[in-house]
């Protein structure tokens, strides 16, 4: 089991990378900051939204965790995301749960690669696997 709680920015990716490398039976992460993708991504059709810093940051949170989920699925994990606590307690309330199946998901990895290219990012998770 690999577990991380409020690991800031790429520290979550480090934990996930450790889990993937060791073929951990389960990975449970509660991400915190999402600065890595925030600094990288751009997508012209969203420029009217992303010119507002707060909206760009919230979209970066979603993109980061969505990419993480797709990558984990591609590497053989069944992934679920849940709100583990009320958003009134903390807005950083997403828990990523991944259970190792051993069956790599080619479609998820293709979608991951496609989204990466579309938004011009190099997610940190790849550096830690």
Each predicted region: which residue ranges?
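Class I S-adenosyl-L-methionine
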Residues: 1-129
């Amino acid at each position: 089991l690999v577990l991380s709680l409020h690991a800031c920015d790429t520290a979550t990716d480090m934990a996930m990378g450790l889990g993937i490398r060791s073929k951990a039976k389960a990975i449970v992460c509660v991400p915190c900051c999402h600065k890595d993708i925030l600094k990288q991504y751009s997508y012209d059709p969203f420029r009217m939204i992303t010119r507002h810093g707060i909206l760009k940051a919230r979209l970066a949170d979603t993109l980061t965790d969505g990419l993480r989920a797709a990558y984990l699925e591609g590497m053989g994990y069944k992934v679920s995301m849940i709100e583990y606590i009320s958003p009134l307690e903390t807005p950083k309330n997403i828990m990523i749960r991944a259970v190792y199946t051993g069956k790599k998901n080619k479609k998820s990895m293709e979608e991951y690669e496609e989204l990466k290219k579309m938004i011009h990012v190099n997610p940190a998770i790849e550096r830690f696997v």
